Amino acid sequence: MTTALEPEDQKGLLIIKAEDHYWGQDSSSQKCSPHRRELYRQHFRKLCYQDAPGPREALTQLWELCRQWLRPECHTKEQILDLLVLEQFLSILPKDLQAWVRAHHPETGEEAVTVLEDLERELDEPGKQVPGNSERRDILMDKLAPLGRPYESLTVQLHPKKTQLEQEAGKPQRNGDKTRTKNEELFQKEDMPKDKEFLGEINDRLNKDTPQHPKSKDIIENEGRSEWQQRERRRYKCDECGKSFSHSSDLSKHRRTHTGEKPYKCDECGKAFIQRSHLIGHHRVHTGVKPYKCKECGKDFSGRTGLIQHQRIHTGEKPYECDECGRPFRVSSALIRHQRIHTANKLY
């Protein structure tokens, strides 16, 4: 189903064209920026057949938009495949989760999954459907608030429910006549190369990334699968300590332990944090929000750690044990204070 370009979308593409004219053709890093690629992707998906003078012009426009989105001169075959998979993955997410993930600007499918896994951990319901009670809705509303959009319905699932095509099934097709004139003027301003030239250019660039080997198809597929699996296990390595990670986002967080970088800063008091989840927990100190409730006595807590420590009062659990005398404690701080007794005795 095709949809006509909205006025806001046309404005975004016009901005891109103006920037290209201003900066010239040698600014490849700017052209490969995630923001610009996302705008081209949106226009590639939303281009309506009625907006083009004819079938060849429509195909040419699609080739140009697709090339600007996937940037074969900047990306390998694997990276282009990842961009396509990332787009489809985002499209099958519920709208609330889709907006949440897009706000973090993931560049790969793995980064998108990491954003969702972080959200699962913060909601303390990993791998399960988030309950629709008011308490959970308030928590998620706080997380979605920075997006600056109204979210009236927050029945969120962390697993796929309906694809975008299923959600749009049965809806009448929109008429693109209103935007046809604007789009014709927009694309006629540029001299678009012929579609055959696009095809040859992209094929040449893609084939250049993968050398040909005189091996059988089965051997190549098996070797490629084995190398891919090994790369996926530990493909991101820290240059400082040699520790490896499966996801680039985990490596980025780890590097901050070496650099001391704390990019997440509290607007209220200025305190900085290494991870975004730590800042979210800290914000509750200022807002007074206590989303964690003890089922035994009903006491509320601002953080999950405080609730866990409190619940040990009811269960009698004392997981922290002194190595010197074997005495157990409910919280680690009590164990640390106790260990000073042994340290003082040794000194005297």
Curated annotation (Swiss-Prot):
Name the InterPro entries on file. Answer: SCAN_dom, SCAN_sf, Znf_C2H2_sf, Znf_C2H2_type
Q: Where found in the cell?
A: Nucleus
Keywords from UniProt, A to Z, are: DNA-binding, Metal-binding, Nucleus, Repeat, Transcription, Transcription regulation, Zinc, Zinc-finger
- In what residue span(s) does the SCAN box domain sit? 41-123
Q: What stretches pass through the bilayer?
A: none
ZnF (C2H2-type) ranges = 236-258, 264-286, 292-314, 320-342
GO annotations of cellular component type:
nucleus
Q: Known SUPFAM superfamilies for this protein?
A: beta-beta-alpha zinc fingers (SSF57667), Retrovirus capsid dimerization domain-like (SSF47353)
* Record annotation: effect of changing residue 137 to Q: In a colorectal cancer sample; somatic mutation
GO MF annotations in UniProt: DNA-binding transcription factor activity, RNA polymerase II-specific; RNA polymerase II cis-regulatory region sequence-specific DNA binding; sequence-specific double-stranded DNA binding; zinc ion binding
Question: Compositional bias of type Basic and acidic residues: which residue ranges?
Answer: 163-184
Quote the function comment for this protein.
May be involved in transcriptional regulation.
Stated name of the protein = Zinc finger and SCAN domain-containing protein 16
What is the originating organism of this protein?
Homo sapiens
Name of the encoding gene: ZSCAN16
